[in-house]
């Protein structure tokens, strides 16, 4: 599906999530295990009795060294199978950003598109109606208005991407496609009798013909009762053997958002996508809320990894 590139999903944790140190280990020039000093880790939010130079506080199950008390890690482990974890690799890249602002130009969507990512239906998707599709800005030098991300943050956004009107509701899907094909043939017959009296006569007629044929083709592939774009009907995502239970999916907006974006991107319907989650400024005055939010982000990250392994 799509351009055949590796699917790319960006998690934009608005507010400035604490990634380096308390979630994923950050070391010196020798890599993750080239540990910082006690004072260095303290600046990253780690107390002296939880330093990663103690092997008990390091987890490398995902091919990337996490702090064993990481909320991200707890969430990812809940959403993934042992086989998926064994096949996962990772890296951490240090980048400077400002706190509590959406002005950090770190969103990579347009760069990923420029590298060749594309989808069968959409180039880019994002869970916010912004130029980048997320909370963070896209670098000005990369912005391409032709492929501005389409907003997808719920299952109905994904399933509604292809709308064939009332035909599917009135007729059986196969009958609806037959009607559209008949319309195409009638229109084609009419076009053969029309002289547009312009130099690009054949080009115009070809575009009209292709438009009708493409509409019928989209209706044939996506206009079925069980919409192939709908994450709710994908048993790998929701259900007894799915990544999310039905109760989790119905009652957690972040899970529904994640499922919608990953359904499109990992199946090649979109080239790349951004999932924005809020509240990562940790300004609640206590640690518990931030830990729960980190764990929920981890659940969503793990869901993307697990779904990628399944499809």
Language-model segments: what does each one mean?
Residues 38-46, 122-128, 304-307:
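Short C-terminal domain-edge/linker segments immediately following a structured domain
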Residues 19-28, 102-107, 276, 285-288:
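Short, solvent-exposed loop/turn and secondary-structure capping segments
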Residues 11-14, 95-97, 275-280:
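Short loop/turn segments at strand-loop or loop-helix junctions that form parts
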Residues 47-58, 132-141, 311:
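Noncatalytic linker/hinge segments flanking ATPase motor cores
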Residues 1-70, 75-91, 99-101:
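Intrinsic-disorder/low-complexity recognition with aromatic hotspots
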Residues 187-310:
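Anion-binding catalytic surfaces of enzymes that hydrolyze or transfer phosphate/sulfate esters
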Residues 18-19, 74-221:
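A contiguous, mid-domain pocket- or channel-lining segment that forms the substrate-recognition surface
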Residues 1-2, 24-28, 126-134, 144-152, ...:
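Soluble secreted/lumenal catalytic domains
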């Amino acid at each position: 599906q799509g351009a055949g590139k590796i699917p790319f999903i960006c998690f934009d944790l608005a507010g400035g999530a604490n990634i380096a140190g308390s979630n994923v280990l950050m070391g010196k020039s020798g890599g993750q295990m080239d540990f910082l000093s006690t004072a260095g880790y303290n600046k990253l939010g780690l107390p002296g009795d939880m330093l990663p130079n103690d092997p008990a506080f390091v987890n490398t199950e995902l091919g990337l060294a996490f702090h064993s008390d990481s909320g991200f890690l707890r969430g990812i482990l809940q959403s993934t199978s042992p086989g998926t974890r064994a096949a996962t690799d990772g890296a951490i890249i240090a980048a400077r950003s400002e706190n509590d602002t959406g002005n950090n130009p770190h969103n990579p969507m347009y760069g990923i598109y420029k590298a060749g990512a594309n989808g069968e239906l959409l180039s880019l998707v994002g869970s916010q109606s912004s130029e980048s599709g997320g909370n963070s800005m896209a670098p000005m030098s990369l912005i391409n208005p032709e492929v501005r991300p389409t907003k997808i943050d719920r299952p109905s956004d994904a399933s509604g991407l292809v709308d064939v009107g009332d035909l599917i509701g009135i007729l059986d899907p196969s009958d609806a496609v037959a009607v559209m094909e008949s319309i195409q043939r009638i229109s084609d017959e009419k076009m053969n009798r029309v002289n547009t009296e312009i130099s690009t006569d054949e080009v115009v007629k070809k575009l009209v013909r292709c438009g009708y044929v493409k509409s019928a083709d989209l209706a044939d592939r996506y206009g079925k009762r069980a919409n192939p774009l709908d994450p709710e009907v994908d048993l790998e995502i929701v259900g007894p053997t799915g990544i999310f239970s039905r109760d989790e999916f119905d009652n957690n907006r972040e899970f529904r958002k994640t499922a919608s974006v990953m359904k499109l991107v990992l199946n090649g319907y979109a080239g790349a996508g951004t999932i924005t989650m809020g509240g990562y400024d940790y300004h609640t005055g206590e640690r518990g809320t931030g830990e729960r939010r980190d764990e929920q982000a981890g659940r969503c990250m793990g869901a993307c990894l697990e779904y990628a392994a399944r499809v």
